[in-house]
From Swiss-Prot:
UniProt miscellaneous comment: This fish possesses three genes for green opsin. Two (G103 and G101) that belong to the LWS/MWS group and one (RH11) that belongs to the RH2 group.
Cytoplasmic side: 65-76, 137-155, 234-255, 313-354
PANTHER family assigned: OPSIN
Sites where a glycan is attached: 18, 203
Localization terms from the record: Membrane
Protein name per its UniProtKB record: Green-sensitive opsin-3
Predominant subcellular localization, coarse grouping: membrane
Pfam family for this entry, one: 7tm_1
């Protein structure tokens, strides 16, 4: 069905009218009428870069955590959950996208498109809700609205279960008829259908549900908890209510989690903003690149969390170096890290960045 500024097919939407006769099915034909071939090659190179970094970084994060028992602390379970989310995006999303970019169209077909869109949405939502759990944990531990509280393994596992449940309630509906996954941007990757008003799929109600429940609500919770947390940390520092080591540990853990939140928002906010604009301006003209740039930039979120974790968590850095160098840390920080870990584990929910 051709509109003024777009063309809707059975399983796709092209942001170009077919009055020129150029529009072709993105599952069958090359899409070089949307962009020059070099742009598809550039996209393939970008995805190759993300795979080359995302796979080893997230994979090594999981491996090092499994190798070192002192990293297997409750709050670290949530951080591992973030690495799992990154692995899902890399293995089940990026690999399909790079193949499509090399070929110039989504040649795997509609079923693979649905799988790729589902996995990308699932990974992104697991990461977002994991950050919500971390934000709530920081709020409860630092602000103490419930008095003295220790984040236990059962709390961590419950939090992980919650992240996957919420992620599934966002990613699964398009697979069962509430909206759908279709190619977007340069037609090399797939996402929810923000573009059409097809009554068969009830796209409007799903998109509103997704934006409100799975973006606005979690982001609001994160901002509220960190707003309260910053005020509490400043008040505690001014009143000297806690020891200097406890305050330092709490500040450093909080800084790490805040940077993870900032990284997620930097990666995903442009995509959410553009998707919202397209949704609320149905029929408006836009280019394939207009959606492609934020869509593919959002995929970089798979790298942010493990990099921040490695840079700011001294205990993890030492364990990583010990693993890399076959049991020896070339920096010789293992002993001091162990001492600081014992102090910080008792005060900051078993996380010890330094």
């Amino acid at each position: 069905m051709s509109g003024l500024n777009g063309f809707e097919g059975d399983n796709f939407y092209i942001p170009m009218s077919n009055r020129t006769g150029l529009v072709r099915d993105p599952f069958v034909y090359e899409q070089y009428y949307l962009a020059e071939p070099w742009q598809f090659k550039l996209l393939a190179c970008y995805m190759f870069f993300l795979i080359c970094l995302g796979l080893p970084i997230n994979g090594f994060t999981l491996f090092v955590t499994a190798q070192h028992k002192k990293l297997q602390q409750p709050l670290n379970f949530i951080l591992v959950n973030l690495a799992v989310a990154g692995m899902i995006m890399v293995c089940f999303g990026f690999t399909i996208t790079i193949s499509s970019a090399v070929n110039g169209y989504f040649y795997f077909g509609p079923t693979a498109c649905a799988i790729e869109g589902f996995m990308a949405t699932l990974g992104g939502e697991v990461a977002l809700w994991s950050l919500v759990v971390l934000a709530i944990e920081r709020y409860i531990v630092v602000c103490k609205p419930m008095g003295s509280f220790k984040f236990s393994a059962s709390h961590a596992l419950g939090g992980i279960g919650f992240t996957w449940f919420m992620a599934m309630t966002c990613a699964a509906p398009p697979l069962v008829g509430w909206s759908r996954y279709i190619p977007e941007g340069l037609q090399c990757s797939c996402g929810p259908d923000y573009y059409t008003l097809n009554p068969k799929y009830n796209n409007e109600s799903y998109v509103i549900y997704m934006f409100v429940v799975h973006f606005i609500v979690p982001v609001t919770v994160i901002f509220f908890t960190y707003g309260r947390l910053v005020c509490t940390v400043k008040s505690a520092a001014a009143a000297q209510q806690d020891s200097a080591s406890t305050q330092k540990a709490e500040k450093e853990v909080t800084r790490m989690v805040i940077l993870m939140v900032v990284g997620f928002l930097v990666a995903w906010t442009p995509y959410a903003t553009v998707a919202a604009w397209i949704f609320f301006n149905k029929g408006a003209a836009f280019t394939a690149q207009f959606m492609a740039v934020p869509a593919f930039f959002s995929k970089s979120s798979a790298l942010f969390n493990p990099i921040i974790y490695v840079l700011l968590n001294k205990q993890f850095r030492n364990c990583m170096l010990t693993t890399l160098f076959c049991g020896k840390n070339p920096l010789g920080d293992e002993e001091s890290s162990t001492v600081s870990t014992k102090t910080e584990v008792s005060t900051v929910s078993s996380v010890s960045p330094a």
